[in-house]
Amino acid sequence: MIMKTVKSFALAAPLAFVTLAPAAAQEFSKELIEKGRYLATASDCVACHTNHDGGKPMAGGLSMASPVGTIMSTNITPSKQFGIGSYSEAQFADAVRKGVRGDGANLYPAMPYVSYSNMTDEDIHALYAYFMQGVEPVDEKAPETKLPFPMNIRASMMGWNLLFRPNEVHKDDPNQSAEWNRGKYLAEGAAHCSTCHTPRGVFMQEQKSLNLTGGQIGAWYAPDITNDPVHGIGSWTQAELVTYLKTGKLENKAQAAGSMAEAVSYSFQHLTDADLNAIATYVRSVPSANAAETTGATRFDKGAAGNEMAAFRGGKYAEGMAGDHAGAQIFAANCASCHGTSAQGTKDGYYPSLFHNAATAGDNSVNVISAILNGVDRHTENEHVFMPPFGDQTNAVVQLNNVEVASLSNYLLAQYGNDKLTVTPEDVQVIREGGPKSNMVQMARIGMGAGVTAVVLLLASVIWYRSRRKTKPTLSA
């Protein structure tokens, strides 16, 4: 028994020392580094850890709006001073899969370690090799995240992790095909689809019972991508979903914008056809938990060509007003030159039709508002798709106010999409500020206040009880 233990230790010790050794002491093969590069691409690391305004790859500095405040992405280059260059492989694995930094501090789940927790040891090893020896070190400090109290106390994430962080590495389902299993591994892990497409609970945790049924992600809404034929993408073919992942567009159906445009630009278009097909196979098998009616027109079939120009041609322009035709006038002045006077788009699909379009016919108006305010910027191998923003940005062609955006949104919805929706200027302001805010900060403050009050009352009770015992008269015989 003792000899078996000694032999086991002798075999395991070298691996343990390799895991704990700094990367500089190891030499990784080109094949392993390339595998890690591919996995990092599938994980979309560069999209979040690079400032898109001239930043260096993986050096951090990207500002990301979240329901609890602005989060800054970190430097994950192998810089020993400002990045992760001094991380052992074990520390790297803990950061990726457990959300714990090399110094022991907790990461915020804006880093999708909840999804990455399913990644295998072999893939973590490949990622480590790539980040240590395949990424150029950048010796620049990224701006720090400064969330409001008490979210700025990173130790608070320990309790969140105990409740909501999975601890199981992916295991293949023997009842499913190899392609399905590969697709699930990528979709639920590296590609972290549920991070955006699954709604969040009170504590900002993914509601797994509503997996992939749609969720708010900053100023955008990641729609239902289950196999629901009406609310999801159950009407899409395998080839259509693969095309969308690779190009970011599907004519007369959908166009990628916001975080999805980034995912296409930096990740999906660079994956192999085999992996894209695997992801599509798995995603198209995910059942819907949406309680809404599953019959009727899909969000890809609503609306028709048309315009209201005859109603106001020759009249006074209604910019800044909320008149009956204000939305149509704003559309004619700012949108029709690209999308067409009847919103039919262009024949090559570069400028999409605004009817038979998921953005205008979705279950909510978020993406209509956000597309107007933030525009679209998507890079693929064959083209650069760009729609200028109409919000507060310096590159906005025209800066529309909330009333104007609401008027334009309502015109687009009524004329070309989901005419059951109505947008108010207040709705526009929410999206302008980066999306709905969570009451989690206030709840945490109230909870901490209640806890402190309870402790104070308990201490006061103890002191009062002890003082009574000391002052209580002693009875003598």
What are these regions (language model features)?
Residues 2-32, 71-74, 95, 100-103, ...:
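Post-cleavage N-terminal segment of exported redox proteins
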Residues 30-51, 55, 59-65, 157-161, ...:
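Sequence/structural segment immediately N-terminal to covalent heme-attachment motifs in c-type
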Residues 437-447:
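Short, low-complexity patches enriched in S/T/P/G
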Residues 50-51, 56-62, 104-107, 138-145, ...:
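Short, solvent-exposed loop/turn and secondary-structure capping segments
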Residues 43-44, 49-52, 80, 96-104, ...:
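Sec/Tat-exported extracytoplasmic proteins
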Residues 58, 72-86, 97-122, 143-147, ...:
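Axial heme c-ligation environment in periplasmic c-type cytochrome domains
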Residues 38-50, 74-75, 90-98, 109-112, ...:
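C-type cytochrome heme c attachment motif
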Residues 58-65, 69, 199-248:
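Active-site substrate-binding loop specific to GH73 endo-beta-N-acetylglucosaminidase modules
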